[in-house]
Design a protein with these regions (language model features):
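Membrane-embedded alpha-helical bundles that constitute the cytochrome b-like, heme-associated redox core
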Residues: 2-238
């Protein structure tokens, strides 16, 4: 019995590896390389930061829209969907890599200055509260949430926390998305990004927001319809 369960888990993992992880890894790496090659500036660290940021954002958006798209197709929505989970894993890997690279773009070798003012700058409160500081602080909080979600995107965590606890934990992905959008908007302004970058960012963000909203209202409508049908089937209480 136990060996059968282990064998089933191994088979499921092999299928996820072949059908999800390898294609996602190859596609993400290819996209990063292509974007790196076409970016105009010569600075390698900036180009790598931008390439991983936009590919990571695309994967995060894809993770968030898989559920609503299944609802629109009237397909059953399981508690944990392997494709969504595996896409989220690669979004997390790229996002954390972007964080590590991004901390070396503007202030080489002095990453703490992304979050606190230099000593020679006179500020009563040492934490940066200008646009640059807020952009980096939202990015840091997003990276923290990303690490948490990445660490718990597995079957062991689902069993450990139980269904309600794991679902509550995974809902922090919406907070992650909000922080990512805030971080992105601030950097569009700080770096005075070109129209192409701004348009790409807005399209991806609005796609996720729109489909999430549609999925939310459809789910509520379906839940109300089910409750109504159950009440009609049971009949009025006497």
């Amino acid at each position: 019995m136990l060996s059968g369960k282990v064998s089933l888990r191994h088979r499921r993992w092999r299928l996820r590896l072949l059908n999800h992880h390898l294609p996602l890894a190859f596609t993400a790496l290819l996209a990063v390389v292509l974007l790196y090659r076409v970016l105009p500036r010569l600075d390698a660290i900036w180009k790598l930061s931008m390439a991983t940021a936009y590919v990571g954002l695309f994967l995060l958006v894809l993770t968030l829209v898989i559920g609503p798209l299944r609802i629109l197709q009237r397909r059953r929505m399981p508690l944990s969907l392997d494709l969504r989970r595996d896409t989220g894993i690669w979004a997390g890997i790229l996002g954390l890599f972007h964080t590590a690279v991004g901390l070396n773009v503007h202030l080489r070798g002095r990453p703490w200055l992304y979050f606190i003012y230099q000593k020679r700058e006179s500020h009563f409160f040492p934490l940066r509260h200008d646009q640059f500081g807020l952009a980096n602080e939202t990015g840091l909080f997003a990276a923290g949430l990303l690490a948490l979600l990445l660490a718990t995107s597995n079957d062991w965590s689902l069993r450990y926390f139980g269904t309600p606890g794991w679902k509550r934990l995974q809902r922090w992905s919406y907070g992650l998305f909000a922080l990512t959008v805030a971080h992105g908007i601030l950097y569009q302004v700080i770096e005075k990004r070109t129209t192409t970058f701004v348009a790409t960012f807005l399209v991806l963000a609005l796609m996720a927001i729109t489909l999430q909203a549609v999925g939310f209202f459809l789910r509520r409508h379906n839940d109300r319809s089910k409750a109504s049908h159950q009440w009609m089937d049971q009949g009025p209480a006497i």
